Amino acid sequence: MAEVEIKQENVVHSRPRLITDEEMHYCPGCSHGTVHNLIAEVIDEMGLEEDTIAISPVGCAVFAYRYIDVDWIEAAHGRACAVASAVKRLHPKKLVFSYQGDGDLTAIGAGETIHAAARGENIVTIFINNAIYGMTGGQMSPTTLLGMKTATTPYGRDAALNGFPYKIADMMAHLDGATYITRQSVHTPANVRKCKRAIRKAFENSLAGNGYSLVEVVATCNSGWKLSPVEANKWMEENMLPHYPLGDIKCSKLPK
């Protein structure tokens, strides 16, 4: 059958140009793929393909460099913001962002992340928060909810034993060097559009030299949560979003 040529004015949606042909390794229903698409679309629309340097983490997104066709550096576990800070200082006109999960960012990388924000580094962090260690078997992370069952909290997270989950975005909003802090999701079409706008705003904030930006994406991990993709979205709405409410947390200018 001959291919039907679709006129550009009739295209409703197409594969983002900067998404490679590599088959993504993510589980069906995972939020990572959607966020990858949004990042690729925003970079393309801003004309930054040749002026972007991204830092990939250790975790489920360790192979992000295979999927988005820009320059990447693979950082040691938790050190993405430290690497991004150095790269941005060496290449101040480039868009530099790190892409990290809740294990890489809020556990082993908490110090590097918080201090990058405190210094007001002109970088962006895309933070995927699914409240579990997806790559290593579904263990508890710092953002795991109270009562949430994981491989290391089979009876549910207990504050007396495991401590409380913490909201790193809210914490970082108190830092003068962090000027744009937002929390989004991609579990509905409307939320996907809002998340895309937030990513673009963060990139623009960085390029304007206005300090550190964090886009937290409250995400699902249906395999780690032992739920179907549909059930995971519902569980996230009912349990994650009350604890991690969506919206802009801080939008300001660097202090003089």
What do these predicted regions represent?
Residues M1-G134, R197-K201, A208:
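Thiamine diphosphate
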Residues M1-V12, P16, D21, L207-K256:
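Flexible, low-complexity linker and terminal segments
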Residues S14, K93, S141-A208:
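Conserved thiamine diphosphate
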Residues D51-A54, K94-F97, N122-I126, D170, ...:
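Structural motif
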Residues V58-C60, N130-I132, T188, V217-G224:
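Glycine-rich beta-alpha junction loops
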Residues V70-I73, A116, S141-L145, E231-K234:
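Short, hinge-like loop/turn segments at secondary-structure boundaries
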Residues A110-H115, M135-K149:
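Active-site-proximal loop->helix
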